[in-house]
Structures are given as C-alpha cells and as structure tokens.
Amino acid sequence: MSQEPLLVVDIPASESKFHIRDLTKVSDSGAPILNGINMDIPKGMIVGIIGPSGSGKSTVLRALNRLWEPPSGTVFLDGRDIRDLDVLNLRRKVGMLFQTPVLFEGTIADNIRYGPQLRGKKISDDEVYKLLSLADLDSSFFNKTSGEISVGQAQRVALARTLANEPEVLLLDEPTSALDPIATQNIEDVLVKLKQKQEMTIVMVSHSIKQIQRIADIVCLLVNGVIVEVLKPHMLSEAKHPMALRFLELSA
C-alpha cells in the first residue's frame, strides 16, 4: 500500500503539467520498486527528485515519456493519458537528457538537426546557432565533431539537440554526475534560463542535494519506491520521515 508524503507544496490541478497516480512496479522477484507513486508536477517549474540509489527515481522519470510502460498506474500530460498519445509525438514534447551524452557521427550542427529531420523539418543555420546559444555554446561549435569537444560540452550539445524538437518538458537523469564543477554550473545556468525565459517544465533526478537546492522549485524525496516528502528546497531540513532524514544527513 502506498504511503502519503508530507505535502508542503500544494499544486492546483489546473497548474499541473503531469498528474501521476498509483504508479507501481515490482522486480522479477516480486520486490516493490515503485509502491503506488502519486505526484503532480507543476507547469513551468524545476522539480528535483532525490533519494537513495535503487529508490525508483529513474524509473519514475522514464514513465513520463514511455521509455518504461508501467503495468499499473496512470500518467496524465496536460490532462490526457499518455497511453493515448502517439509515442513519437510524446517524446518530442517530453525530451530527455541522460547521464552520459551520446552524439552521432558528423558535425555538431548535424546532431542538432537530427530530430527535426526525422519529422521532415529543416533547421536553418541561423536556427542551429540559436540552439547553440540556448545551450551556452558559441558559433565555433557549428562544424566541430564530437571528438573535438569535452564531455561537458557534449552534454550541452545533447541538450541543444533535444531543444531542437521544441519540447514542453525536459527530463534529466543525473545530467551532470560526470561533469566537473564548471561544466555542472553551465548546465544548471542553462536549465534556469529555460525555466525563466521559456517557462519550460523540468524534472531532474539527482544525487546532489546541493544541486537541487540551487535550482529546483520543488523537491520530492523518494525512498523505497515511495514519495515520502514533497518540500521547497529551503525546507529540506524540516523533513520528517526517518529514512529521508537519514539520507539527508549522510548526503550533507
């Protein structure tokens, strides 16, 4: 049976981008991975999901654009069951950035054009330059290849490639865990700008509590497949759940 988290953040239904109800997953051995997840993700905010390894954070993220199909539970996007949406259109609206960037052969410009080209849409050079700028990359990257750039720069190229599909939502699964502090700050700055200037909804899984405190509007603490706390970042010290308190203490 799912447990009700300490809800310090009240999100009206009209302001919810994602409405998630009774999301459940069990392992092959029958052990619960997600235990009836209920949560609402507000429009135009950065939501951080934190918790111990194996608590189900990435599984929740993958359910939001159907990279994982839950056997039980429902996910609504703007009031519509995502199972009723064309999966390719869903993944255009709900872009995802992974921990390790994977770039295709060819130039950086070729990478950025890839998604729109699959839909028969041409991206002009000017549009590529704008997308590079959105990802905090200058025009010199246009004709470079993946072998000529750093991992941090490759992650920003992957972000620009995702933004080329004009998503309404960005899902990020530990996008800075392999990056140095400067590259991490670059990514964080880009995410905050996307929220502020484009009112983009961003859902980010991270093991770094400090990172979530820096950029998130709302924090969800996930423990053993259950959301046990939903708090504002500055209120993390007021968490009540024993497992959440232990995780926060060890992560400090």
Predicted features and spans:
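Conserved ABC ATPase "signature" region
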Residues: 125-141
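Helix-to-loop junction immediately C-terminal to a conserved catalytic motif
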Residues: 65
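H-loop/switch region of ABC-family ATPase nucleotide-binding domains
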Residues: 206-207
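Conserved signature/switch motifs of ABC ATPase nucleotide-binding domains
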Residues: 165
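Catalytic Walker B motif of ABC-type/P-loop ATPase nucleotide-binding domains
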Residues: 170-173
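C-terminal boundary and immediately downstream tail of ABC-type ATPase nucleotide-binding domains
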Residues: 234-252
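Conserved ABC ATPase signature
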Residues: 145-149, 153
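Helical segment within the ABC ATPase nucleotide-binding domain
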Residues: 185-197
